[in-house]
């Protein structure tokens, strides 16, 4: 008997390790361990936690519709494994790996526990389009790519030649067993989590991610190149929340996009390459998760952080974007860059404060991708924005939403202003953008020189 741990793969089809599990020809226990370190009651109230639990509820329904068994518990994965191993004739432990520091530590503890119990282990990475080691070998690289454009050019070649199709094995090809009640009782869900899961269930469509993908490819892909930065148009794919939780496979997403014969696919596929580039950095850049410890942040402060978080900066596009984030958990990618750079550059707040805020608020939160965006805006990491690049939020607003439709939607109190006036800093603006730019260039130039 095997035990399968669901992670960021909240689906029942196109799972890399399901093929291997099928080849074992043995029944298995399928379990999702909700980890208190990653999901506590406060996080569950935020958009990121609610979205994740929404996908968990869908996973439950997928198992129920397939007449299969899924155990959902709350606790430490290694302790759950110890109890399972003591009660069932387990032989194999299987899961898809993750790459954040905590995930690596958690996975290593689980591997050590499995080996201490005399169990074999099967692991793999499932959420990248490329295999980093095979990709570097294909590119004949002994040093990792640090700039996106050459990475992307080689990535396209690799995908054209070796793109992995979706996996054929689904949950229906496996045999799952129901565990005894004492297992679930030992690691029972807190009442608040049980209520959260129950509250999301009635409105869930089990095939929602696939429908969303098809809707985007048919209705929005033709205008994606022109519209993805025009945030007032709502032409983004809105697929990231499904991709980042594994509710839909990245292989399926790529394959269906690549099959589009209209010629509109390249711009969106480039965004999938950016996603792989951040994941590649997390594997190859040893400092990716430790930049906050590498620099002296004494020249920075958090005095203006609350104004930014509460949408009270007096800069209309910043306040509109932060309002949308707070109310819905969504924010267009262009505005994620603008708001992040505003906090880190114009307000001189260390990036990790904004990163932590987005961790709670973004419905589509992913630790690696969120960090990658904040590092870019802070001129840190591979292929980051130059330290002297300081986006002017007013100019960004004028360029990408000339009529101010987005600001009018989220800040209706400004809707009466003209198309020109609506973009401008308000009388209560907390910072002078010109002076802030000069200060940011000076401070970041000094910060980066210190570490050379």
Name what the model sees in each region.
Residues 62, 109, 113-117, 357, ...:
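Alpha-helical structural signal in soluble globular domains
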Residues 68-78, 309:
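Short beta->alpha junction loops
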């Amino acid at each position: 008997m095997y035990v399968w741990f669901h992670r960021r793969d909240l689906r029942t089809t196109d799972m890399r390790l399901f093929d291997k599990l099928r080849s074992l020809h043995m029944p298995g226990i399928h379990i999702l361990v909700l980890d208190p370190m990653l999901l506590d009651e406060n996080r569950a109230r935020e958009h990121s936690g609610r979205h994740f639990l929404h996908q968990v509820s869908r996973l439950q329904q997928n198992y129920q519709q397939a007449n299969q068994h899924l155990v959902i518990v709350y606790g430490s994965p290694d302790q759950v494994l110890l109890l399972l191993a003591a009660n069932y004739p387990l032989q194999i432990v299987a899961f898809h790996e993750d790459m954040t520091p905590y995930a690596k530590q958690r996975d290593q503890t689980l591997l050590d526990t499995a080996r201490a119990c005399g169990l074999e282990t099967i692991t793999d990475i499932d959420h990248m389009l490329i295999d980093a080691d095979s990709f570097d070998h294909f590119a004949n690289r002994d040093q990792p790519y640090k700039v996106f454009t050459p990475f992307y050019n080689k990535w396209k070649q690799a995908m054209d030649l070796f793109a992995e199709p979706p996996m054929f094995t689904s949950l229906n090809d496996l045999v799952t067993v129901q565990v005894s009640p004492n297992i679930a009782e030992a690691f029972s869900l807190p009442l608040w989590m049980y209520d959260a899961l129950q509250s999301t269930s009635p409105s869930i469509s089990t095939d929602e991610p696939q429908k969303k993908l098809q809707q985007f490819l048919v209705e929005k892909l033709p205008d994606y190149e022109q519209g993805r930065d025009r945030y007032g148009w709502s032409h983004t794919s809105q697929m990231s929340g499904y991709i980042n939780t594994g509710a839909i496979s990245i292989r399926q997403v790529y394959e269906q996009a690549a099959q589009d014969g209209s010629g509109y696919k390249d711009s969106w596929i480039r965004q999938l390459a950016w996603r792989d580039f951040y994941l590649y950095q997390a594997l190859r850049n040893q400092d990716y998760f430790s930049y906050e410890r590498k620099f002296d942040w004494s020249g920075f402060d958090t005095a203006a952080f609350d104004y930014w978080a509460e949408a009270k900066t007096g800069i209309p596009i910043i306040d509109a974007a932060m309002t949308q984030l707070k109310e819905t958990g969504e924010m267009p990618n262009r505005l994620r860059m603008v708001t992040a750079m505003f906090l880190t550059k114009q307000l001189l707040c260390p990036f990790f404060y904004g990163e932590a805020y987005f961790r709670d608020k973004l419905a589509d939160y992913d630790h690696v991708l969120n960090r990658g965006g904040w590092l870019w805006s802070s001129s840190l990491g591979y292929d980051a924005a130059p330290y002297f690049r300081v986006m002017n939020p007013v100019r960004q607003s004028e360029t990408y939403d000339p009529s101010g439709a987005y600001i009018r939607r989220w800040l209706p109190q400004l809707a009466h202003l003209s198309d020109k006036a609506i973009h401008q800093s308000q009388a209560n603006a907390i910072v002078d953008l010109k002076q802030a730019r000069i200060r940011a260039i000076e401070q970041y130039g000094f910060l980066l020189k210190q570490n050379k």
